[in-house]
Amino acid sequence: MGAKIQADEISSIIKERIDNFELNVDVNETGKIISYADGIAQVYGLKNVMAGEIVEFENGEKGLASNLEESSVGVVILGKGEGLREGTSCKRVGKLLETPVGEALVGRVVNALGEPIDGKGAIAATETRFVEEKAPGIMARKSVHEPLQTGIKAIDALVPIGRGQRELIIGDRQTGKTTVAIDTILNQKGENVICIYVAIGQKSSSIASVVRTLEESGAMDYTIVVNASAADSSALQFLAPYTGVTIGEYFRDNGKHALIIYDDLSKHAVAYREMSLILRRPPGREAYPGDVFYLHSRLLERAAKMSDERGAGSMTALPIIETQAGDVAAYIPTNVISITDGQIFLETNLFNSGIRPAINVGLSVSRVGGAAQIKATKQVAGTLKLSLAQYRELEAFAQFASDLDEATRRELELGQRMVEVLKQGVNKPLVIEKQIVIIYAGTKGYLNDIAVKDVVRFEAELHAFFEQKYSNILEAIKASQKIDDNTETQLKAALEEFKTVFNAN
């Protein structure tokens, strides 16, 4: 009897073991490299791989499945590609490309995969996000209505940028495009805006210089730099903007404000063209692939002003495009102009003639316009664009005319002084209330009897005078964001007083 009980126990134990048995077998779909060149591997055997999926090679290198062909897969290598050769095996990871996001990245320099490259140790990010995300839909957005002050008089007065807008900075090389972008970052100090600077295909020395400028100004406290330098592969240069925008979306979706700069998208398009041609995709105009428009539209559409239900956060994009000999009708410039909400044109001729920032006021527009300006700026800068346009027209005409009538001469003199007023030094953004004071002085005729060569000195001394003696006027403009009758009376009296002091000197 005892033996029978023992047999029952044994059989129940065996049954229990069978019921609870788990076969922990790691099943992976694997493949082998059949050819490898220029950072692209053709892999055979990954039958069920998804487009954009991560593929891991036996030496730890990772790649991105880009071309899904009948018999093989074109995999873009996300690294140096050392040790990869024909016959190297690889496996599917079953994940799409992700990047770390969050507050931990602020103040850091990362590569196109979100990995730190500044020598300050690992980043303790608590969250990751997919690099390729859909842009917010119409109902998730709100129209752009809050100003994003750049600190640059010519932009804030004439082509204002709003939070959630996409404003293109376009011009030839060495016209000050990056400087405009960096000054905008510097001006966000204390504005509770997280800035992301994405460098694509730049020299490492240039990036080091930008980071040094940001550190010296204390701007790295609210800035993240994403760098895919000229030494990096075309795949990493292609990915960098998407990594940057994903990092920015974290802040946008959490009710904060972000500013992202892509420097520059011309090199981004070139990197994508290089990648596409190696993948043997059919070339189109200027040898770019057919989806180069979508490359930039899906990136820039992710900048948005979110609705109140979604937290009312925003992400503003300032893409940069480099033109060749001022040709804004080339393929990539026209594409990006049509995607963005306006553009700031920088001209070589203006730059060389000492007008810096070299903004062509006639060609630069903001399609958001007055909605992105405070009332005080609208009050003082309303007529400025028109008078500058008239000045440019008269300037060309006046070169041939010997005797000018009084009205024309006055228009020319006002134009000359306003051009001087809009000049600004490198990395010297100006707070909006000071911009308003000097533009008010210019448009209301307080500069008419000041020599053109003295206008820059007049402005510098005016700001110092207001800081010392009439800071209450600056504070009133900043607080109310408009010039009421009382403020205007005080402003006029202060300007008269300053002119007396200035002329005496």
Curated annotation (Swiss-Prot):
EC number of this enzyme: 7.1.2.2
UniProt entry tagged with the keyword Cell membrane: yes
Residues binding ATP: 171-178
Record keywords, A-Z: ATP synthesis, ATP-binding, Cell inner membrane, Cell membrane, CF(1), Hydrogen ion transport, Ion transport, Membrane, Nucleotide-binding, Translocase, Transport
Disulfide bond entries: none
Gene3D superfamilies attached to this UniProt entry: 2.40.30.20, ATP synthase alpha/beta chain, C-terminal domain, P-loop containing nucleotide triphosphate hydrolases
Chain positions of site Required for activity: 364
Reactions catalysed: ATP + H2O + 4 H(+)(in) = ADP + phosphate + 5 H(+)(out)
One Pfam family hit: ATP-synt_ab_N
Family matches, as InterPro entries: ATP_synth_asu-like_sf, ATP_synth_asu_C, ATP_synth_asu_C_sf, ATP_synth_F1_a_nt-bd_dom, ATP_synth_F1_asu, ATPase_a/bsu_AS, ATPase_F1/V1/A1_a/bsu_N, ATPase_F1/V1/A1_a/bsu_N_sf
Chief location: membrane
SUPFAM superfamilies cross-referenced by the UniProt entry: C-terminal domain of alpha and beta subunits of F1 ATP synthase, N-terminal domain of alpha and beta subunits of F1 ATP synthase, P-loop containing nucleoside triphosphate hydrolases
GO MF, one annotated term: ADP binding
Membrane protein topology class: Peripheral membrane protein
Compartment list: Cell inner membrane
Summary of the function given for this chain in its UniProt record: Produces ATP from ADP in the presence of a proton gradient across the membrane. The alpha chain is a regulatory subunit.
Subunit note: F-type ATPases have 2 components, CF(1) - the catalytic core - and CF(0) - the membrane proton channel. CF(1) has five subunits: alpha(3), beta(3), gamma(1), delta(1), epsilon(1). CF(0) has three main subunits: a(1), b(2) and c(9-12). The alpha and beta chains form an alternating ring which encloses part of the gamma chain. CF(1) is attached to CF(0) by a central stalk formed by the gamma and epsilon chains, while a peripheral stalk is formed by the delta and b chains.
Designated name of the protein: ATP synthase subunit alpha
Organism for this UniProt entry: Aliarcobacter butzleri (strain RM4018)
